[in-house]
Amino acid sequence: MNYLGFDIGGTKCAAVLGNREGRVLCREAFPTEGPDATLEKLFQAAESFSERACAAGVSCGGPLDEASGVILSPPNLPGWDRVEIVRKIRERLGIPVWLCNDANACALAEWRFGAGRGTRSMVFLTFGTGMGAGLILDGRLYSGACGNAGEIGHLRMERLGPVGYGKAGSFEGFASGGGIAQLARAAALEQFQQGKFTAYCRTPADLDSVTDKSTAQAAEAGDPT
């Protein structure tokens, strides 16, 4: 039996077809847009796959109402307010559908097929547009009473610092892709104020184009900033 997986991220989305052994048979990815445009692309990808799936799972950053299958209003998905994603996919594809927090879905996959195999307890950290955690405790996924047990991105690390989910100095602010870009822009601005520049940002006009990817590339190339 094969299964569909839809991952909805703040930067990009993906549709995959896989089997029970965790092998990916087909995959398509594309930039995230609004809910209607993104869903249509996910549907088209699923319908283009050569084999039919018997069920589908959707992973998405929270907050979610997993029981009713609704994406509430994730901070990294502007415009995705109360999207009844499970109903929409079920009606279009005619198969059972489940919604799961993306970090929890990753934790389950890693525990079942990856580095967590054979463990009783583990923590999976996600670092993307935002950040979060999935918890496997004593052989079971632990999501908490309201499904937010892994929302560690809200933890405050410093009184001041880059902003993640509206909170300065939060774990997400320091460690997510968006937070890393904020830190890199601040470092570049400090260099400009000293009459210097960085390899990843040579003029103040380039500040808005600094991303986590360009920052990582500069670090790999040996930029001391």
Regions found by a protein language model. Name each.
Residues 1-4:
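Extreme N-terminal starter segment of soluble prokaryotic enzymes
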Residues 19-20, 26, 59-62, 66-67:
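Short, conserved active-site loops that position catalytic residues or coordinate cofactors/metal ions
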Residues 35-43, 47, 54-55, 65-123:
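Glycine-rich phosphate-binding loop and adjoining helix at the ATP-binding site
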Residues 11:
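Conserved Rossmann-like nucleotide-cofactor binding loop
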Residues 7, 102, 128:
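Active-site glycine-centered loops adjacent to acidic/histidine catalytic or metal-binding residues
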Residues 60, 67, 101, 137-138:
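A cytosolic small-molecule/anion-sensing beta-strand core signal
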Residues 16-20, 26-28, 33-37, 98, ...:
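Glycine/GP-enriched mid-protein hinge/lid loop-to-helix segment characteristic of carbohydrate kinases
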Residues 59-60, 73, 127, 176:
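A secondary-structure boundary/capping signal
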